Regions:
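An amphipathic, basic-hydrophobic helix/alpha-beta surface used to engage anionic
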Residues: 1-195
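Exposed, interaction-prone extracellular/peripheral surfaces
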Residues: 82, 110-113, 117-301
Length: 301
C-alpha cells in the first residue's frame, strides 16, 4: 500500500512503520521525500521488530544499509545570470580556437614530418606506394574554468554566502554547457567523504553537468579548507598545471583578501581573461583594490 496510515515520524531522524502480513507476502512502501538542502543524505540502518512464534517475546533484527540520496544544489536564476552570461560569453567567443574534429573527415593527403602516425591511412598508402594521412575539418572549442572559493570572507563564516556561491557555480555551469562551452571547476571546498579538494576536468554535455552538480552537492563546508590564494599559486608553479591562455576564468569568491586579489591579478595579466563574481549581503562593499578589472556583485537575498 502507498498510504501512511500505519507510519509515524518521531523526528527528522527516525521513522516507524507498522506492518501486518502473511507468509510469502511482500509489502512495498513508497516514501515521498522533499529535498530542501544540498548535500548527501544517508539511511544508515534499519531495525525490524517482531513478535516470537508464540507471541511471548519481542525480537529485534538490525540491518546495515548503504542507501543515500545526493541532492544537487539549486542552480542560480537564469534571469540574474544574464549580465554574467554576456560578459563570460563575450570573453569565451574571443578566446575560441580551432581543433581538428576526428568525426568530420575531409580527405587524404601526403604524409609530412609533422603528422602523427595514428593519422596514417594504411590502405591508401598501400595503393599509392607513399605514406598518406587522413585530414579532418576543424571545429571551434571554447573553454571556461570556474574557480570556486569557499573560504570565509572575514572572522565569521556565513552558510548563506557559501550556498549562494555554490548555487552560482551550478547555474553558470548549466548555462555554459547549454551553449556548448567546455566547463571545468577548481574549488577549495572538500568532498564529504574523501576530504579532497573538488576538481572537475573540462567537458561538455548533460553527463558532464551531472558530474559537476554531483561534485558540488558533495562539498562539506564544515571541513577545513586550504587558502585559495595558496592553491592558485601552486597552479602558477612551472611543475604544475599552467594557466591556459585560451581559457576564460570565472572566480566566485566572497573573500576579497589582499593576497587573493594579488594572485588573481597576476593570473589576469598572464593573458588569461578573468571574471570575478562577489556574493555579498545588501549594502556590503565588494570592490577590488588590487585588481585591474571590475568585479561583478551578486547580492545574497
Amino acid at each position: 500500500p502507498d498510504t501512511d496510515t500505519n507510519s509515524s515520524v518521531s523526528d527528522k531522524t527516525y521513522r516507524n512503520d507498522v506492518f501486518s502480513f502473511l507468509a510469502n507476502q511482500r509489502i512495498t512502501r513508497k516514501v515521498p521525500v522533499r529535498c530542501t538542502k544540498r548535500g548527501v543524505f544517508r539511511i544508515s540502518g534499519l531495525e525490524i521488530t517482531f513478535a516470537g512464534l508464540f507471541m511471548n517475546e519481542i525480537n529485534v533484527l538490525k540491518s546495515e544499509n548503504e542507501c543515500e540520496i545526493t541532492v544537487y544544489p539549486k542552480a542560480a536564476d537564469a534571469r540574474e545570470l544574464k549580465p554574467v552570461n554576456s560578459r563570460i560569453s563575450g570573453e569565451a567567443q574571443r578566446k575560441k580556437y580551432m581543433l581538428e574534429d576526428p568525426f568530420v573527415f575531409r580527405g587524404i593527403r601526403d604524409y609530412t614530418s609533422n603528422d602523427s602516425l595514428k593519422n596514417v591511412n594504411w590502405k591508401a598508402s598501400a595503393r599509392t606506394g607513399n605514406l598518406m594521412v587522413n585530414e579532418y575539418d576543424e571545429s571551434v572549442s571554447r573553454n571556461v574554468c570556474i574557480l570556486l572559493n569557499l573560504e570565509e570572507s572575514g572572522a565569521l563564516r556565513y552558510d548563506a554566502v557559501d550556498e549562494e556561491a555554490i548555487s552560482i557555480a551550478s547555474g553558470i555551469a548549466e548555462m555554459l554547457v547549454s551553449q556548448g562551452i567546455n566547463v571545468s571547476i577548481i574549488s577549495n571546498g572538500c568532498d564529504v567523504d574523501t576530504h579532497n579538494h573538488v576538481f572537475v576536468q573540462g567537458g561538455a554535455g548533460t553527463g558532464h553537468l551531472n558530474n559537476i552538480n554531483t561534485a558540488l552537492a558533495r562539498i562539506d563546508t564544515g571541513i577545513a579548507m586550504e587558502e585559495y590564494s595558496a592553491m592558485l599559486e601552486k597552479i602558477l608553479e612551472p611543475d604544475n598545471m599552467r594557466i591556459e591562455s585560451e581559457y576564460v576564468y570565472v572566480l566566485i569568491s566572497a573573500s576579497r583578501r589582499k593576497k587573493l586579489q594579488s594572485v588573481i591579478n597576476k593570473i589576469s595579466r598572464l593573458q588569461a581573461d578573468m571574471v570575478w563574481i562577489v556574493p555579498h549581503f545588501p549594502g556590503d562593499d565588494y570592490g577590488l583594490e588590487l585588481c585591474d578589472f571590475e568585479p561583478v556583485g551578486w547580492e545574497v537575498k
